[in-house]
Amino acid sequence: MPKLAAFPKAYMDDLVVHGTMTLRQWIDLAATLDIDGLEFYTGLIDLQDRSRWPEARKATEDHGMTIPMMCASPDFTHPDPKFRQEQVDKQKFWIEMTAALGGTYCRVLSGQRRPEVSRADGIEFAAQCIETCAPFAAQHGVTLNIENHYKDNYWTYPEFAQKMDVFCDLVERIKVPNFGVNYDPSNTILAGEDPLVLLERVKHRVVTMHASDRTLISGTIADLQKEEDSIGYAKRLKHGEIGQGMNDYDAIFSTLKSVGFDSWISIEDGVDGFDQLKGSVAFLRRKMAQHWGPQYGTSNRHA
């Protein structure tokens, strides 16, 4: 049964950098949405002390929600093996965090697209690191889900495996059972490629999804690509309300349903306010009901 989660995209700096919002405040706010769970980010200030993990889990479950997904951003493509080992160690900590919170999916990435790292080396570095983490994740009941990613909020370079061919080669290279794809259609558009073509290539490996829509405030995709090497997201890029951007959710959900997708869809939206996030929830609920059946049109938490 597909379920709907939300990610605190609009509140990342408040929760990760400034500490001007507590995790409990986000949980209580998100609980007013018609969703089934929450996706957390590993950099949340309130999660850095493992003694606070039970508190975060209880606060979420008290609202009738779960924390199925953890958004982690390991950087596995650095040429220094010591750096990569440090990233593996961090990923294992995040896997422990995921399991302690009751989650079953912890994101992995390839890493940053550093100009000095070749395609072959980057794929090898990332694959080795992910395969090193996979048995540890399995011991904790966690599946590693790699996202076709654009860029972490706090990275300098864009994702090494941003382009479809590189991403698919990396996914194909990794054969461990507790590994799959976290599909994000918007990120494919940012790579100048077709999200439906990517979905067709990886649909049998998709275990979770990031629901988002993107628009360019000004300029073109080509202009955006010129700005990739600045820290954070390019300023001309905008997360929009889902259903009002460039993604065809009827085609996306139809494809996912055709392969028996039965997992979590996490909303990455709301940067223009909480009402925008509410609108995205309403849109996705309508589409879930349309494609999977009327029972998926609500979480029933507020019944």
Region locations from a protein language model:
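Short Asp/Glu-rich motifs
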Residues: D49-R50, P79-D80, V117-S118, T156, ...
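Histidine-acidic metal/acid-base catalytic patches
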Residues: M1-D34, A161-A303
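N-terminal pre-domain/capping segments
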Residues: M1-G103, D121, A127-E131, A138, ...
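Active-site groove signature of glycoside hydrolases
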Residues: T98-R119, H140-N153, S266-I267
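Active-site-proximal loop/turn and secondary-structure-junction residues that shape catalytic pockets
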Residues: A10-M12, T42-L44, S73-F76, S110-R114, ...
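Surface-exposed cleft-lining segments at the edges of enzyme active sites
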Residues: D80-P81, Q112-I123, Y150-E159, H239
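Conserved beta-strand positions in the central sheet of alpha/beta enzyme cores
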Residues: E39, M69-C71, R107, N145, ...
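Basic- and aromatic-lined ligand-binding clefts that recognize polyanionic substrates
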Residues: Q139-K175
